[in-house]
Amino acid sequence: MNKKTLKDIDVKGKVVFCRVDFNVPMKDGEVTDDTRIRAALPTIKHLADQGAKVLLASHLGRPKGEVVEELRLTPVAARLGELLGKEVKKADEAYGDAVKAQISEMKDGDVLVLENVRFYPGEEKNDPELAKAFAELADVYVNDAFGAAHRAHASTAGIAEHLPAVAGFLMEKELDVLGKAVSNPDRPFTAIIGGAKVKDKIGVIESLLDKVDNLIIGGGLAYTFVKALGYEVGKSLLEEDKIELAKSFMDRAKEKGVNFYMPEDVLVADDFSNDANVKIVPISEIPSDLEAIDIGTKTRETYADVIKNSKLVVWNGPMGVFEIDLFAQGTKAVAEALAEAKDTYSVIGGGDSAAAVEKFGLADKMSHISTGGGASLEFMEGKELPGVAALNDK
């Protein structure tokens, strides 16, 4: 990686503004899943141990530039304190004189969580004045929020113009793992692309067709490809305006010698619930009054075989509606194949795929689970991420 990291700077006695991704699920004022907080611990501990005064900035939810009481970061600061085993203070603002006064009382190694940066309308607009106000608090900027790296916001991009700016450990690991997958993958290299819509994955499919040996398609977006082969898809998800594009993707795969895998059979249902009547049919026989909601048993076996014979697998998007147990078997089969594959390095591209491996209790069997859904997709597409571009070069 050609960006400066924590290893390139001395932070002793300095105030460090560290952008983290604490956008965690909450219920009744409690953090229900602290995965993202735990992911930032190595960077936070390193900064504190090295004698920095650590300011932590994050967004939470979508307050749209105004104060929303239930989106304050107070419960997050409390949970972080439990994980660190020490007191973590919380500011009521993210910049300004009151925050500066709190910072002046900090000792080396202390941690202060700033208020939700999205309470300020300037954050998402990358307002230069707000970026400057953030920068005035600190001596050094560290970005450890890979999950927000594809956004050019005041706390992810603008602030870096005013301070020495380096990547935290989590950001560094994400860029190293995904960077190797994109530029120098172990082969056979397989990408699994699922999810609901073709339109959300156009860029990543286009980019991966130049890099992979095998491309596996699943989820709702698969039925546009099924239709492109000339089959009827019943009531399944279908993007009529993307059928020609699906055809061109299949043609390009053939030209490039990429093995293109799509469902051979599917699970069809008469309802979107655990009580639905279901059956498995070949893709050539999807009934007109039913909807395909998951991949079938034959397809699961084929996909599992491809996975187990791959050296590197990148997975982005589920095979079916895994939130409903009846329609979770395809996604589970992929997760289990990855968990069982001995010589396969598995990269889970955040978002729904990460939620799925968590749900099936297989997260610890994956080589790398990305903390950024949108960011990892854009990185795989070959786009420059503003939060990374803003950091100092080595």
UniProtKB/Swiss-Prot annotation:
<feature type="binding site">
    <location>
        <position position="201"/>
    </location>
    <ligand>
        <name>ATP</name>
    </ligand>
</feature>
<keyword id="KW-0324">Glycolysis</keyword>
<feature type="binding site">
    <location>
        <begin position="59"/>
        <end position="62"/>
    </location>
    <ligand>
        <name>substrate</name>
    </ligand>
</feature>
<keyword id="KW-0547">Nucleotide-binding</keyword>
<comment type="pathway">
    <text>Carbohydrate degradation; glycolysis; pyruvate from D-glyceraldehyde 3-phosphate: step 2/5.</text>
</comment>
<feature type="binding site">
    <location>
        <position position="118"/>
    </location>
    <ligand>
        <name>substrate</name>
    </ligand>
</feature>
<dbReference type="InterPro" id="IPR001576">
    <property type="entry name" value="Phosphoglycerate_kinase"/>
</dbReference>
<keyword id="KW-0067">ATP-binding</keyword>
<comment type="subunit">
    <text>Monomer.</text>
</comment>
<feature type="binding site">
    <location>
        <position position="151"/>
    </location>
    <ligand>
        <name>substrate</name>
    </ligand>
</feature>
<dbReference type="InterPro" id="IPR015911">
    <property type="entry name" value="Phosphoglycerate_kinase_CS"/>
</dbReference>
<feature type="modified residue" description="Phosphothreonine">
    <location>
        <position position="299"/>
    </location>
</feature>
<dbReference type="InterPro" id="IPR015824">
    <property type="entry name" value="Phosphoglycerate_kinase_N"/>
</dbReference>
<feature type="binding site">
    <location>
        <position position="36"/>
    </location>
    <ligand>
        <name>substrate</name>
    </ligand>
</feature>
<dbReference type="GO" id="GO:0006094">
    <property type="term" value="P:gluconeogenesis"/>
</dbReference>
<dbReference type="GO" id="GO:0043531">
    <property type="term" value="F:ADP binding"/>
</dbReference>
<keyword id="KW-0597">Phosphoprotein</keyword>
<dbReference type="GO" id="GO:0006096">
    <property type="term" value="P:glycolytic process"/>
</dbReference>
<keyword id="KW-0418">Kinase</keyword>
<feature type="binding site">
    <location>
        <begin position="350"/>
        <end position="353"/>
    </location>
    <ligand>
        <name>ATP</name>
    </ligand>
</feature>
<keyword id="KW-0808">Transferase</keyword>
<dbReference type="GO" id="GO:0004618">
    <property type="term" value="F:phosphoglycerate kinase activity"/>
</dbReference>
<comment type="similarity">
    <text>Belongs to the phosphoglycerate kinase family.</text>
</comment>
<keyword id="KW-0963">Cytoplasm</keyword>
<dbReference type="Pfam" id="PF00162">
    <property type="entry name" value="PGK"/>
</dbReference>
<dbReference type="InterPro" id="IPR036043">
    <property type="entry name" value="Phosphoglycerate_kinase_sf"/>
</dbReference>
<feature type="modified residue" description="Phosphoserine">
    <location>
        <position position="183"/>
    </location>
</feature>
<dbReference type="GO" id="GO:0005524">
    <property type="term" value="F:ATP binding"/>
</dbReference>
<protein>
    <recommendedName>
        <fullName>Phosphoglycerate kinase</fullName>
        <ecNumber>2.7.2.3</ecNumber>
    </recommendedName>
</protein>
<dbReference type="GO" id="GO:0005829">
    <property type="term" value="C:cytosol"/>
</dbReference>
<feature type="binding site">
    <location>
        <begin position="21"/>
        <end position="23"/>
    </location>
    <ligand>
        <name>substrate</name>
    </ligand>
</feature>
<feature type="binding site">
    <location>
        <position position="323"/>
    </location>
    <ligand>
        <name>ATP</name>
    </ligand>
</feature>
